[in-house]
Amino acid sequence: RCLREIYLKGFEIAVKEGGARSVMTTYGSVNGLWTAGSYDLCTTILRKEWGFQGIVMTDWWAKSNYEGHQAEVTAKAPMVAAQNDIYMVVSDAKSNPENDDVEEMLHAGKITVGELQRNAANILGFLLKSPSVLLLTDRICKEELEAMNTKEEDDVDAGSLVSIES
């Protein structure tokens, strides 16, 4: 109850009222399961209950774990299964220096090609709804794009909220 009423409330508002198109999972765990690989958080609540249709990404160099196991940087398969679409940051995807377990777990049957395709579809869907693609495909005009980027009277300028004193 505390999770939903306090910790997730801001995310719920951002998704349902603010139209958020991307969400970043935290660098931490809830009840022993790291959020980046939590199916309950990334799919059940975010996508199914709240209707989120964007992309989910990890915090940088996030860890993940299987229930009852220690969190590891190499455990990326739980993220795939949870519908966490993008792992941030991979220094060289071709050589896999982080030794992620996606290919191994795919061959072991722990994740499916369908889950990988679902994550890819989430990313592609996000890109296809980007203002750049909408403009290129004539689904919006330059004036509409400019209107999207125009500051409204009641918009908050984040720079005005921060003051740095030396």
Positions of predicted regions on the chain:
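Glycoside hydrolase catalytic-domain context in secreted enzymes
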Residues: R1-S166
